[in-house]
């Protein structure tokens, strides 16, 4: 059984200096999804060293949080993000530092791209170039397909808006996961079969069926092709398990419970952890994989 927890925080500033903090009491709440907004992390650290606390006050500071189990695969990256808010206060005899982190924050907020291509250029080429300009590594699901710009393509503006435009024309969707640009099919998945969850491997309690009506986006008529209404037809479930840092939205997870059994797509997740406390859980919103009609 995986009972011995591990944690580590790494601070990296704009000049690539690094400071690692281990052995501290930490608490975190992480929310990740396939939305184009940044994933977020609320992090609380007790008795952080002054040197590391000073680094957190610098512009463009990146915080990397790793957690895991010493009797399993050890430390795994659970979140990487830019510090947008940070403050410290005394609570009894403890100095508490609270911060808010956002994944891909600088890339989404600041990146301006200028691209121009001749006719018949692949949309993959455009995505690769946008990712490079945004300072992001890009990963593609292995079933992604790319059309071309028959009449060429040019764009000047925010990188995120360029990604919207390029992906919309080839039935793809993008998100940023751990500072990596993730590209999958609209309504698809990464095809990464992450883990298998059973009561013996960390599944907790009963899975809960999700009852959702059509989203507002599904009701609106747009000129762009969208598969969002189809996604609403799939059966969804809320699943709780022991903390699983390797899981990301878009991945596949195998669930073996009394209620459901099979592979499901992770649409969103929340990690909640307290190193010395009771919380050390992951909550998943998953959907069954339905063949295309």
Which residues does each predicted region cover?
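Single conserved hydrophobic/aromatic residue that forms the stacking wall/gate
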Residues: 1-11
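Short beta-strand-centered interaction patches in the first periplasmic/extracellular domains
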Residues: 94-106, 133, 137-213
């Amino acid at each position: 059984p995986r009972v011995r927890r591990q944690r580590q925080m790494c601070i990296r500033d704009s000049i690539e200096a690094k400071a690692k903090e281990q052995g501290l009491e930490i608490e975190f709440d992480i929310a990740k999804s396939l939305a184009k907004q940044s994933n977020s992390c609320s992090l609380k650290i007790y008795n952080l060293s002054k040197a590391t606390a000073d680094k957190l006050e610098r512009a463009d500071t990146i915080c990397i949080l790793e957690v895991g189990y010493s009797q399993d695969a050890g430390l795994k990256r659970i979140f990487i993000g830019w510090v947008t808010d940070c403050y410290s206060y005394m609570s009894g005899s403890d100095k508490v530092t609270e911060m808010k982190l956002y994944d891909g924050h600088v890339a989404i907020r600041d990146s301006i791209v200028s691209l121009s291509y001749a006719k018949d250029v692949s949309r993959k080429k455009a995505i690769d170039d946008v990712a490079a300009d945004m300072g992001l590594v890009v990963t593609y699901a292995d079933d992604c397909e790319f059309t071309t710009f028959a009449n060429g393509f040019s764009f000047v503006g925010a990188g995120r808006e360029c990604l919207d435009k390029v992906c919309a024309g080839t039935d793809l969707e993008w998100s940023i996961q751990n500072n990596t640009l993730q590209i999958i099919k609209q309504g698809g998945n990464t095809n990464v079969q992450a883990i298998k969850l059973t009561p013996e491997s960390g599944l907790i309690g009963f899975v809960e069926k999700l009852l959702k009506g059509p989203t507002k986006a599904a009701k609106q008529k747009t000129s762009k092709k969208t598969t969002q209404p189809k996604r609403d037809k799939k059966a969804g479930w809320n699943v709780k398990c022991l903390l699983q840092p390797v899981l990301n939205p878009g991945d596949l997870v195998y669930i073996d419970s009394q209620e459901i059994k099979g592979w499901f797509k992770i649409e969103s997740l929340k990690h909640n952890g307290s190193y010395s406390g009771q919380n050390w859980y992951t909550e998943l919103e998953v959907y069954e994989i339905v063949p295309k009609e």
